[in-house]
UniProtKB/Swiss-Prot annotation:
Name of the molecule in the record: Acylphosphatase
Taxonomy, superkingdom: Bacteria
Sequence similarity: Belongs to the acylphosphatase family.
The enzyme's E.C. designation: 3.6.1.7
Alphabetical list of InterPro entries matching this protein: Acylphosphatase (IPR020456), Acylphosphatase-like_dom (IPR001792), Acylphosphatase-like_dom_sf (IPR036046)
Any single Pfam family the record assigns to this protein: Acylphosphatase
PROSITE patterns: ACYLPHOSPHATASE_3
Gene: acyP
Length: 89
């Protein structure tokens, strides 16, 4: 199991980005969370096997149709053994 912290910038608030990420993560059996950050970005903590995280990262780098992704930054982090994937306020 691997873990990534992903920060996505651009037009990502108010366009369904968190819900898109939530649905995708649950479909791919990824654990963690997604939240809107105060700086206008979206932050994601994702835990899954490496090959699944690679595909997830590709998908969230595009985002939902109304989003405009400008920047995607990610780093490997320690897993926190989440049991679900949640939208965090």
């Amino acid at each position: 199991m691997q873990a990534l912290f992903i920060k996505i910038s651009g037009r990502v608030h108010g366009v369904g980005f968190r819900y898109f990420t939530y649905k995708l993560a649950n479909k791919m059996k990824i654990k963690g969370y997604v939240r809107n950050a105060e700086d206008g970005s979206v932050e994601i903590h994702a835990e899954a096997p490496e090959e699944i995280l690679v595909e997830f990262l590709k998908a969230v780098s595009i985002g939902p149709p109304m989003a405009t992704v400008i920047s995607v930054k990610y780093e490997r982090v320690a897993g926190q053994n989440f049991t679900s994937f949640d939208i965090v306020p």
